UniProtKB/Swiss-Prot annotation:
This is 5-oxoprolinase subunit A. It comes from the Bacteria. GO terms for biological process: carbohydrate metabolic process. The gene is pxpA. Forms a complex composed of PxpA, PxpB and PxpC. The keyword ATP-binding applies. InterPro entries: Glyco_hydro/deAcase_b/a-brl, LamB/YcsF/PxpA-like. Its EC number is 3.5.2.9.
Amino acid sequence: MTVMDLNSDVGEPFGAWGMGDDAAVFRSVSSANVACGFHAGDPSVMAQTCRDAVAAGVTVGAHVAYRDLAGFGRRFLDCSPTELADDVLYQMGALEAVARAAGTTVRYVKPHGALYNTIVHHEAHAQAVVNAVKAFGGDLPLLLLPGSAALRAAEKAGLRAVPEAFADRGYTPEGTLVSRRDPGAVLHDAAQVTERMVRLAEDGTLTAVDGSTVRIHAESICVHGDTPGAAAMAAEVRAGLDRAGITVRSFA
C-alpha cells in the first residue's frame, strides 16, 4: 500500500487581516502547519485553527519562523543560534498550549519561509532549530527539504527528518526547487500538478524543468492554500491521489 502525507500552511490570519481558506484546505490535507504568531497568526487564530483541525481529523504541526510578523517570515534574521532556538521553543510551547486546550497536541515541526530556506545551508541556524525541538521533548519529527543541512542535523540528533516535495513548484535536474526568479518555478495547471504528484507518490520521480527525469524522495507533499485557486488545486491533488489508490495519511 502506497501512503503519502499532504501538508499545508494554515492559521495565517492576524487580527482583522485574513489569509487563505483554511476550511477548504482541511478537507484536503492530513497535516496542518499552524502559524505560531511570529510570522502570522495570533492566539485566537491559533486556538480556532487547532479546534478546526481536531474537527477535521487533521494532525497539527508547529509552523515556526523567524520573528518577522511585518514581513510574513520571508526575511532572513541575523540572530544568534541561542536566540533562534529560544524563539522556536517559545513558538512550539505556545502552540502546544492551545492545541491541548483544543484536544490535540503538536505532533511535528516545520520551519516557515526564510527560516525554512536558510536552514537548507546555514549550519548554525539549522542546529538551533534542532536544539529547540530536542529541548521541547518528545522527539518530534521535522518536516524539511531533502538534502538540507537541517535534515542532516536532525538525523544526527536522533530526530526523524521527514523529506517533503512541493506540489506547485518546478524542480531542477539536480532535484532542487527552481528559483522563483526563473521560468517554470511555479506551476498553475491543477491537472498537471496532480499528475506529477501521483507519479511522485507511485515511483518517486518527477519531470525536471529541462524535461529530464529526477528522483525525489518525499514522505509528504506540501499543497499551498493561501493563493488564488490554491485550495482548489489542493483538492484536486487529494482527489487524484485517492483515485490512484494512494492512502493519504499523516506521517506524524
